[in-house]
């Protein structure tokens, strides 16, 4: 399966070369393929904030490379450069507060810096660590793809009709994808009849990105309005809802793109299995439950302006980016460390105690 997944890979969103970070601008896909070059931590932070790059794993990887760029500039300035680099890292951390992968990656970079020995080049060490973060995410996605496909086969061996939300493919990660990685693997094994992709308002990641990725790989995909999801479960034989995650708490609650919670509620009502796919770096064992997650809100103009015209001077907007799905609505969380079925605090702790990959 690994070789088949590698052969099928067609999309990437992050490239590190020539001492610079290149990001595919996901705001203009699928109409244009525009790459931006970044040479400063400030530039990378702005790219994360403005969603040039998005998806929790991709954000973490980009932040790690941003830390390298910050270190290069601060070291070149001379003197006591570490406090200035910490300011750069804080700027990166503030760019998207919900995605725990961002903080995980920056903490790894800090830890690596603390382990640099006298006489060694800290910049070389940081660059190696950022590349390792990128490659390990790619490897984790390959592992999760196989584990998720195996889980589908174990529960339902017939052809599957899957519903997914937002974008969780190669564009959102270091390669292959999380939820879309599982869908890719299941398709290669002949288990996918059709994928329904929520359009995912207001940024339309489903219609702009997910449908584009799936169509590029020849996976049958139908785009649907977010509000059609429950109707699809009732009338189109949906067998699985498969989504990613931006943060998973110690009890198995999942923060993901706004609209995920209502999918889980509808799936429970219709007897549709609900799978979350995310690397272990998304799991925050320091956070007890989803009640503690700070939910990012974006500019209300994303909802209030239609065709460049404001809908009403007195109208206000509520525009949260994420919601929290309680663990008791989730059938399985798939990580590179293994699978947790019917997640709870004890099962999550057991998963995270494992020191090796599955």
Curated annotation (Swiss-Prot):
Domain of life, source organism: Bacteria
Site entry (Transition state stabilizer), positions: 166
Pathway: Amino-acid biosynthesis; L-methionine biosynthesis via salvage pathway; L-methionine from S-methyl-5-thio-alpha-D-ribose 1-phosphate: step 1/6
InterPro entries the UniProt entry points to: IF-2B-related (IPR000649), IF-M1Pi (IPR005251), IF_2B-like_C (IPR042529), Initiation_fac_2B_a/b/d (IPR011559), M1Pi_N (IPR027363), NagB/RpiA_transferase-like (IPR037171)
UniProt EC number: 5.3.1.23
Keyword terms: Amino-acid biosynthesis, Isomerase, Methionine biosynthesis
Catalytic activity reported: 5-(methylsulfanyl)-alpha-D-ribose 1-phosphate = 5-(methylsulfanyl)-D-ribulose 1-phosphate
SUPFAM superfamilies per the UniProt record, alphabetical: NagB/RpiA/CoA transferase-like
One MF annotation (Gene Ontology) recorded for this entry: S-methyl-5-thioribose-1-phosphate isomerase activity
Catalytic site: 246
One GO BP: L-methionine salvage from methylthioadenosine
Gene3D superfamilies xref list: translation initiation factor eif-2b, domain 1 (1.20.120.420), Translation initiation factor eif-2b, domain 2 (3.40.50.10470)
HAMAP family attached to this UniProt entry: Salvage_MtnA (MF_01678)
NCBIfam families reported for this sequence: eIF-2B_rel (TIGR00524), PRK05720.1 (NF004326), salvage_mtnA (TIGR00512)
PANTHER family: METHYLTHIORIBOSE-1-PHOSPHATE ISOMERASE
Family, per entry: Belongs to the eIF-2B alpha/beta/delta subunits family. MtnA subfamily.
Function, as annotated: Catalyzes the interconversion of methylthioribose-1-phosphate (MTR-1-P) into methylthioribulose-1-phosphate (MTRu-1-P).
Protein name, per record: Methylthioribose-1-phosphate isomerase
Source species of the chain: Pseudomonas savastanoi pv. phaseolicola (strain 1448A / Race 6) (Pseudomonas syringae pv. phaseolicola (strain 1448A / Race 6))
């Amino acid at each position: 399966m690994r070789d088949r997944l590698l052969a099928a890979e067609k999309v990437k969103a992050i490239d590190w070369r020539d001492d610079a970070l290149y990001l595919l601008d996901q705001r203009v896909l699928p109409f244009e393929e525009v790459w931006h070059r970044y040479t400063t931590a400030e530039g990378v932070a702005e790219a994360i904030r403005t969603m040039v790059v998005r998806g929790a794993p991709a954000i973490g990887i980009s932040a790690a490379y941003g830390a390298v760029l910050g270190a290069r500039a601060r070291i070149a300035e001379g003197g006591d450069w570490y406090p200035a680099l910490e300011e750069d890292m804080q700027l990166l951390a503030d760019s998207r507060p919900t995605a725990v992968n961002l903080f995980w990656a920056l903490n790894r970079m800090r830890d690596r810096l603390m382990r640099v020995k006298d006489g060694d080049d800290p910049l070389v060490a940081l660059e190696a660590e950022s590349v390792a973060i990128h490659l390990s995410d790619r490897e984790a996605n390959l592992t999760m793809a196989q584990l998720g496909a195996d889980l589908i086969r174990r529960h339902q061996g017939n052809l599957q009709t899957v519903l997914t939300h937002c974008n969780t493919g190669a564009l959102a990660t270091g390669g292959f994808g999380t939820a879309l990685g599982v869908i890719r693997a299941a398709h290669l094994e002949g288990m996918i009849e059709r994928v329904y992709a929520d359009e995912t308002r207001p940024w339309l990641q489903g219609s702009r990105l997910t449908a584009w990725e799936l169509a590029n790989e020849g996976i049958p995909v139908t785009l649907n309005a977010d509000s059609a999801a429950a109707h699809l479960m009732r009338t189109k034989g949906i067998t699985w809802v498969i989504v990613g995650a931006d943060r998973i708490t110690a009890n198995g609650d999942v923060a993901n793109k706004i609209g995920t919670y209502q999918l889980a509620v509808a799936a429970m009502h219709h007897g549709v299995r609900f799978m979350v796919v995310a690397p272990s770096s998304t799991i925050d064992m320091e956070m007890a439950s989803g009640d503690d997650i700070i939910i990012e809100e974006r500019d209300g103009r994303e909802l209030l302006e239609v065709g460049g015209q404001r809908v009403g001077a007195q109208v206000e907007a509520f525009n949260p980016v994420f919601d929290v799905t309680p663990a008791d609505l989730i059938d399985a969380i798939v990580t590179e460390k293994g699978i947790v079925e019917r997640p709870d605090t004890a099962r999550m702790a057991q998963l995270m105690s494992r020191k090796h990959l599955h």
